[in-house]
């Protein structure tokens, strides 16, 4: 039975990742600052900023999925966010390399593109935003994610470890769909995330597929649903909120996501299964 350590497994996404790996027959260890609300697997309380503790919790693992982080900008002092997110990721990858672990998945973010937490509202250079889009954050959170992706590149160069960095869209647990009717008809809401989202169950499956994939090297992948989180068609969203953007790389038919997931689908053989439209009744009104 392969063993995977999930850091941040007690969190909103982490608990779904833990659940998915357990259901697929993996031995799972949750490494976090608190225990899981339901005992899906063994939990180890760990400070990821302490390299020795990280070595201890990763010992014997075949793979690590690193989700633990300060998850947004401006919730903590900027330097605290940067230090925590960068050092914890460095320690996880450094310890994994030292222990001979060959597979890692780390949580990056769509925030690295620079739109989400910009001081003044800015639009994308083109849509759908793919992994080649410039990353121009103005905040320590987005910058920390770029540094983490570069740490992944370095570890791969040095050791050959496969490290997949997920630039996650807005992560949505199933119980959050009840809030969607409050915003799906208002283009002004959620514009900074380009109206993207990803169901926790689809993100969890992507984590497993990345662990099971071979030959990816160090690669960053957008993880988003196929559709936007809005009832308004995607072209209308862009015309209403970002009329200055004229570079459309696809036809933007219907409600196509403005955060491209094509690379992840191709490399991981992954297909998002969960859409908010299947959970929310009467959204067309």
List where the protein language model places each region.
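C-terminal substrate-binding subdomain of Rossmann-fold SDR/epimerase-dehydratase oxidoreductases
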Residues: 201-285
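Catalytic helix-loop patch of NAD(P)-dependent Rossmann-fold dehydrogenases
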Residues: 83, 119-159, 190
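Conserved Rossmann-fold NAD(P)-dependent oxidoreductase catalytic core, especially the SDR/UDP-sugar
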Residues: 91-138
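Glycine/proline-rich active-site loop of Rossmann-fold NAD(P)-dependent oxidoreductases
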Residues: 158-162, 173-185, 209-220
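NAD(P)H-binding glycine-rich loop region in Rossmannoid oxidoreductase-like domains
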Residues: 37, 46-84
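A conserved pocket-lining segment of Rossmann-fold NAD(P)-dependent short-chain dehydrogenase/reductase
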Residues: 131-138, 165-198
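NAD(P)-cofactor binding segment of oxidoreductase domains
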Residues: 64, 76-105
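N-terminal Rossmann NAD(P)H-binding glycine-rich loop of SDR-like oxidoreductase domains
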Residues: 4-24
């Amino acid at each position: 039975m392969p063993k995977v350590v999930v850091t941040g497994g007690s969190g909103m996404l982490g608990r779904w990742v833990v659940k998915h790996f357990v259901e697929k027959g993996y031995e799972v260890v949750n490494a976090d600052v608190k225990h899981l609300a339901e005992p899906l697997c063994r939990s180890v309380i760990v400070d990821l900023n302490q390299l020795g503790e990280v070595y201890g919790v990763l010992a014997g693992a075949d793979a690590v999925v690193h989700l633990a982080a300060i998850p947004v900008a401006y919730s903590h002092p900027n330097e605290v966010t940067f230090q925590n997110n960068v050092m914890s990721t460095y320690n996880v990858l450094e310890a994994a390399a030292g222990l001979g672990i060959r597979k890692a998945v780390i949580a990056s973010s769509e925030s690295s593109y620079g739109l989400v937490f910009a001081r003044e509202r800015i639009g994308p250079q083109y849509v759908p935003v793919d992994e080649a889009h410039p990353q121009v954050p103005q905040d320590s959170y987005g910058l920390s994610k770029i540094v983490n992706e570069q740490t992944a590149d370095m570890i791969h160069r040095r050791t050959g470890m496969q490290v997949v960095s997920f630039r996650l869209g807005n992560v949505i647990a199933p119980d959050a769909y009840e809030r969607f009717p409050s915003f799906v008809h208002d283009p002004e809401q959620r514009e900074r995330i380009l109206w993207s989202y990803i169901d926790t169950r689809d993100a969890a499956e992507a984590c497993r597929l990345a662990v099971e994939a071979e030959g990816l090297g160090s690669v960053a992948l957008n993880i988003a649903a196929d559709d936007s989180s809005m009832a308004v068609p995607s072209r209308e969203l862009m015309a209403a909120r970002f009329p200055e953007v004229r570079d459309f790389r696809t036809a933007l038919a219907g409600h196509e996501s403005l955060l491209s997931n094509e690379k992840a689908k191709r490399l991981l053989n992954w297909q998002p299964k969960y859409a908010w439209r299947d959970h929310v009744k009467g959204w067309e009104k």
